[in-house]
Structures are given as C-alpha cells and as structure tokens.
Amino acid sequence: CFAAENTDIQSAENCKGFSETTRQISYPKGRDLREFFKWLAGVIDGDGNFDVRSVNSQLVLKAIRIKLHDRDIRILSYIQNTLHIGRVRSDKNKPHSIWIISKKEEMFYLINNINGLIRLKVPGLKKSCNYLGIDYKEANYNFGPYDPYFAGLVDTDGSIVFNYSGNRIECNLEFERNEFSSKLNFDNVIPNYKPAVSF
C-alpha cells in the first residue's frame, strides 16, 4: 500500500518484449517521516536483522538488513526511495531480496529514528545503540488506533484471509512467544474490535 504512492512504473518495448523500470521519486525537503519510521520499525521487527558481531572481543554493528521474498521487493524499493540510503540486493539462487545498510553514518541515522519503536528485535537494537553511543529507548507496547507499526508487521509477517465459514476477513500475525512478543497489546489498533490471541 505504501509503495504504490511513491514509485512510478514505466514500461518500454524492446525487441524481446516489454521491460519495467521502477523510478525513484523525490520528496520535498523537511518531509515528516515519523509515521514512516513507525511502519519501518514493524517491518524490521518482522523480517529485519541487526548484524552485530564480535570483532577482537568487541561487539561491532556490521549492517542492518531487511530480507523479503522477491514478490515484496516493492517494500524494499519504497524504503530505499524514502530514506535515500542503502542498497537492494537480490539473491541469484533464491527468491529473496535484501535491503542493506552498512555505512556507520547511515546506521546511526536509522537507529536514531527507530529507537523507541522496536519491540521484538530489542537485543539487537540495544547492542546497536551501545555500539553507536546512542541511549536505548524502550518502546510503548500499547498501540493506538491505526498504528503504522502494525501495518509493517502485517506487510512482513502477516496474512489477510477471507474466513468463509465465519463470513469475515481476518488479519493474522504469528509470533514466537517470548518476553517481548508477550508484551504486545493490539487491543486498540482496530477501533471497536479486540483481537483474538491463541497460543
């Protein structure tokens, strides 16, 4: 849903058929990205990774990655086009693509903007904050109506299905139960509807 507003597809015919090019769209300076970073935190908690390694007995943040199936490459393009940082790399032997940032200043920028929004990949965020000299901020696990974080989780780890027997549309999220996921409270994300939780 985010990608459609921010990319433009052009088709061009050549001797072998048609090809499509996704063009980057620029945004006005001073654009407010707070809602975007909430959504991005959900995407990172879903399919992101803070690559923190031990180098010479010290923890080092090597990269921040988001790995998605190729069918979702527009999500990665949207992130790259909005932030104007990172690169998207495709795996030739597998149907996956990765958005990756590894420059220290880019990782510093991203961590500063998602600090206080990450709820599931907390250990990696804490180590990243420590490496970059940023004070870790704990996120609020109670979500308000239509929180973009929820959309980010659904975009990566969710599914929307039609339940024929119940005659309703369902949005499903599946988590590994741990100390962080057990604190998630989605009771107010969809007004007038409390989600069912099963273990």
Can you say where each PLM-predicted feature lies in the sequence?
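Internal intein/HINT superfamily modules and their associated LAGLIDADG
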Residues: 1-199
